[in-house]
């Protein structure tokens, strides 16, 4: 940090297993990725190349190398995994990840329907090739999953070998754990947390109000994802009480 301030909550140090910030890169150029890393690197843990953008990104290898040079793991969005799966190209997906040096993989079923046991089978297979994040929740706002089912799915996917379960929100933050307005389904979140360890959940929270909710609920070391590159420093400031929304949250406290 650039100067000394007392009563700042202690953030877990990188490489960390909780307090993760996952950034969604929806199409940064190589130069933009370099510029982003020059300021964002200390506060970014994982970068996701959103949905299928990796298929159409020029100079993909060069961009991946930028993130690699900062020891930031990158993974392809779960929609790309589903695109391979629906075309019966699961083995090709593994090959593509290997060819591009991708060791983090997302397993999701937000756009397609597959039996849950089959999804868990893919998680188990991919753990042999790297770190697996599995996403729970539908991208269809009309598809409401009851809390007990969220818990059941998350538990099974963690047991299958997922390092984290991602709570679906899309890049807009208006499905899954959120209502169409972006408001948090608080009852759902709190019920999930009675059964699933918070440090194993990566909450997609693209909106500031959503990030604030989880920081207030779980502290500065909550795992948050789908953060825009331009929002990394604002989020880090909010995590440690240096933004108006959380200014008083950690004052007179030893730890977050």
Label each region the model flagged:
Residues 3-7, 191-256:
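C-terminal alpha-helical cap/extension of soluble enzyme domains
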Residues 49, 106-111, 159-174, 221-238, ...:
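Glycine-rich phosphate-binding active-site loops on the catalytic face of alpha/beta enzymes
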Residues 29-31, 54-67, 83-92, 110-130, ...:
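Active-site-adjacent beta->alpha loops and helix N-cap segments on the catalytic face
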């Amino acid at each position: 940090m650039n100067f000394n301030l007392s009563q700042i909550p202690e953030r877990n140090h990188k490489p960390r297993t909780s307090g993760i910030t996952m950034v969604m890169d929806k199409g940064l150029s190589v130069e933009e990725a370099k510029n982003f890393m020059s300021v964002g690197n200390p506060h970014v843990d994982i970068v996701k190349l959103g949905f299928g953008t990796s298929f159409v990104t020029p100079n993909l290898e060069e961009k991946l190398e930028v993130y690699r040079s900062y020891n930031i793991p990158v993974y392809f969005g779960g929609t790309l995994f589903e695109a391979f799966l629906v075309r019966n190209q699961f083995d090709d997906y593994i090959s593509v990840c290997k060819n591009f040096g991708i060791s983090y993989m997302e397993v999701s079923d937000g756009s397609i329907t597959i039996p849950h046991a089959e999804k868990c089978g893919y998680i188990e297979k991919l753990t042999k090739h790297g770190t697996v994040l599995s996403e729970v929740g539908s991208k269809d706002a009309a598809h409401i999953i009851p809390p007990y089912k969220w818990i059941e799915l998350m538990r099974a996917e963690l047991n299958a070998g997922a390092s984290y379960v991602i709570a679906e929100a899309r890049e807009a933050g208006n499905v899954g754990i959120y209502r169409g307005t972006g408001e948090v389904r608080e009852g759902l979140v709190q019920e999930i947390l009675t059964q699933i360890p918070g440090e194993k959940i990566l909450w997609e929270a693209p909106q500031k109000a959503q990030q604030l909710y989880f920081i207030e609920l779980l502290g500065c070391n909550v795992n948050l994802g789908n953060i825009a590159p331009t929002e990394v420093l604002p989020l880090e400031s909010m995590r440690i009480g240096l933004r108006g929304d959380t200014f008083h949250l950690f004052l007179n406290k030893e730890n977050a």
